């Protein structure tokens, strides 16, 4: 499904998505047109889902992170859709166990957090909630560990 060159290209793009194609080609030792074709195929296959800018949440008065564990009554599809529609909600994960969902959200402060929780509480399917406020984020990434795929890393 992947070869070593694909893995190397993916490692480079995960490090810096805006790197010029010519630089990727130089690093993998291929012609820019061949690298561009590989990247296009990785995109078509859904391996590369997209490219995005990571913003500093504190610069937008969203420095407070919280995780909300939500127990549901079984109407999970409707609950997931409703949770996903809340702008401060960044992630919605359906989980195994007594909780139906684990939700990550960002907001300005505790007052705003309380308002968002008041939006969540009456949603269809929500039975109970437990909230954990993040004191400090030690690591946060969307990178995929490619060393498990090919057994080694170039870093």
Give residue spans per PLM region.
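A compositional/biophysical signature of low hydrophobicity enriched in polar/charged and small residues
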Residues: 1-155
């Amino acid at each position: 499904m992947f070869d070593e060159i694909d893995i190397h290209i993916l490692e480079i793009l995960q490090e810096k998505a805006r790197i010029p194609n010519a630089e990727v080609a130089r690093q993998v030792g291929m012609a820019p047109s061949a690298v561009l074709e590989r990247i296009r195929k990785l995109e078509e296959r859904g391996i590369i889902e997209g490219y995005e800018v990571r913003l500093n949440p504190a610069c937008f008065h969203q420095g407070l992170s919280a995780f909300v564990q939500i127990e549901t009554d079984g109407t999970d599809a409707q609950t997931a859709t409703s949770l996903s529609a809340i702008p401060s909600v960044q992630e919605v994960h359906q989980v195994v166990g007594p909780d139906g969902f684990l939700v990550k959200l960002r907001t300005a402060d505790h007052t705003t957090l309380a308002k968002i929780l008041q939006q969540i509480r009456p949603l269809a399917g929500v039975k109970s909630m437990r909230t954990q406020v993040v004191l400090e984020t030690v690591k946060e990434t969307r990178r995929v560990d490619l060393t498990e795929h090919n057994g080694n890393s170039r870093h």
